[in-house]
Design a protein with these regions (language model features):
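Catalytic core of DAGKc-family lipid kinases
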Residues: 100-179
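Gly/Ser-rich helix-loop-strand patches that form or flank binding pockets
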Residues: 86-96, 103
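Short glycine/serine/threonine-rich phosphate/pyrophosphate-binding segments
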Residues: 22, 77-83, 189-195
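Redox-cofactor binding/interface segments in oxidoreductases and associated redox assembly factors
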Residues: 13, 72, 183
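ATP/nucleoside-binding phosphotransfer catalytic cores, i.e., glycine-rich phosphate-binding loops
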Residues: 154-155, 169-172, 219-300
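ATP/NTP phosphate-donor binding region
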Residues: 1-69, 110-125, 136-146, 275
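Gly/Ser/Thr-rich active-site loops/lids in small-molecule metabolic enzymes
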Residues: 174-219
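A residue-level signal for conserved active-site and pocket-lining positions in enzyme catalytic cores
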Residues: 16, 71, 75, 97, ...
Length: 300
């Protein structure tokens, strides 16, 4: 897919609502866009945070339909939330980090104008990330659906372990007794799945990681399968029935015999990075891979 900077005229702005530093950065970007002749558009939630009453405002659900590029100011969670609303429009997204790790929101606030100008001039890397579509079915009927950029997680309501069957592409894999299962995209492999002992998948990989959560059998290890795989989880009778969540959002309770279906979403997120983006450098910085060695390298 080709994305041309010449089409960047209407620029959507989304900000994390609970940080004053976000308002400062959003205001800086807003004023800069106007100064270079572009048209900023707030999503309705962000518009409530800023003092610009004459700037166009659109609901987040429709923002991707009216803008050519969306700038998200916040943490990775803010970009996850925005991605789920924007992906069906194929609208490119760029992130400014006002959160913690910032694997997805990789522009520093101190560099925002310089880096943003590079992107607006066509100097960017296109990073296409796939999402999951998830369905919960009861007796064959669809009772809940959601999309996820990071992961779909089956988990218990309490500390009790749960029993479930896992199938991949119609083939039975195992029945497991554990705290749950994390089904992760490459994007999500540096999030919750990583803390569960899962592998780090490069964002370009067409793969899915399945990471057991504290399995009762120590031989139950993470599995990596092809990105086109269809995952099915069947719930058995449990002392406390499990729940499922997509990207850590609303959790839905599952009953005996309910099935969870996970597959690749038909659309991809078009994530833009400024020049010089390096996934491995992000891992070194965010995950502290070089801790203890940087001072030694400087001494050498």
């Amino acid at each position: 897919m080709q994305i041309s900077h010449k089409n960047f005229r209407n620029i959507g702005l989304i900000g994390r609502p609970d940080k004053s530093s976000v308002v400062e950065t959003i205001s800086l970007i807003h004023d800069h866009l106007i100064s270079i002749g572009l048209h900023p558009v707030f999503d309705s939630e962000t518009a409530e945070l800023v003092p610009y009453k004459n700037t166009q405002t659109v609901s987040r659900a429709l923002l991707g339909e009216v803008v050519d590029l969306v700038i998200v100011v916040g943490g990775d969670g803010s970009l996850l939330h925005a991605a789920r609303a924007l992906v069906k429009f194929n609208t490119p997204v760029i992130g400014v980090n006002r959160g913690r790790l910032g694997f997805l929101t990789d522009i520093k606030p101190t560099e925002v104008i310089f880096k943003l100008d590079q992107v607006l001039k066509g100097q960017f890397q296109l990073d296409r990330r796939f999402l999951f579509e998830m369905e919960v079915r009861s007796k064959g009927d669809l009772i809940y659906s959601a999309i996820a950029l990071n992961d779909v997680v089956l988990h218990g309501k309490t500390v009790h372990m749960i029993d479930f069957d896992l199938s991949i592409d119609g083939q039975h894999v195992y029945r497991q007794h554990s705290d749950g299962l994390i089904v992760s995209t490459p994007t999500g492999s540096t999030a919750y799945a990583l803390s569960g002992g899962g592998p780090i998948l490069h964002p370009s990989m067409d793969a899915i990681a399945l990471v057991p959560m504290h399995p009762h059998t120590l031989s139950s290890r993470p599995i990596v399968v092809g990105g086109q795989s269809e995952i099915k989880i069947a719930v058995h009778e449990n002392r406390v029935m499990p729940m499922v969540s997509a990207d850590g959002q609303q959790s839905v309770s599952l009953g005996v015999g309910d099935t969870l279906h996970i597959r690749k979403h038909p659309y991809k997120l078009n994530l833009l990075h400024p020049p010089g983006y390096d996934f491995y450098m992000a891992c070194r910085t965010k995950l502290g891979w070089n801790q203890g060695f940087e001072s030694l390298q400087q001494q050498d």
